[in-house]
Amino acid sequence: ADYLLIMDSDGQCDPRQIFKFWNARKKADLVVGYRIKRRDFLYRKFFSDFAKLVYSFFFKVKLKDPSFAFSLIRKDVYKSLQNFTPSMPEGFFWEYNARAIYKGYKILEIGINHKKRKYGDTQIFQVWRLPKIALINFIGLLRVKFDLLTK
């Protein structure tokens, strides 16, 4: 296959919207989704908005939703970006998108409908874990920034 499709399996993404990514694939190296009318708890939205502010300060990346796991990536782009040890375990896509932009890849954003979670509960972003996750990801942002500056 020439492309890799990444999509969460919690029912918040509508697989019928994959065609939007497929139709846009020739316009960019990575096609990434952003949530229209995000259907998450308020604390998740707040945490994400704050993280996006910090992220855009560090990387000067202008993505609407850099953490969203609904993407279509060309195989050669994926292979060129897979050789790094993630610095942000709960923020993989934040890091992946920053590395793609720093390598000069073009990213196209596609708005997608976002639904309430159908299956399971979040294991990562539980309220009691947010301070620890914020600290780990902040340190991860520093590591990624340093790594990108030294290459």
Show where each model-derived region lies:
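Short beta-strand-to-loop acidic/aromatic patch adjacent to the donor-nucleotide binding site
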Residues: A1-Q12
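Active-site loop/turn elements of alpha/beta-hydrolase fold enzymes
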Residues: S9-G11, R35, I112
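C-terminal, non-catalytic tails of nucleotide-sugar-dependent glycosyltransferases
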Residues: I136-K151
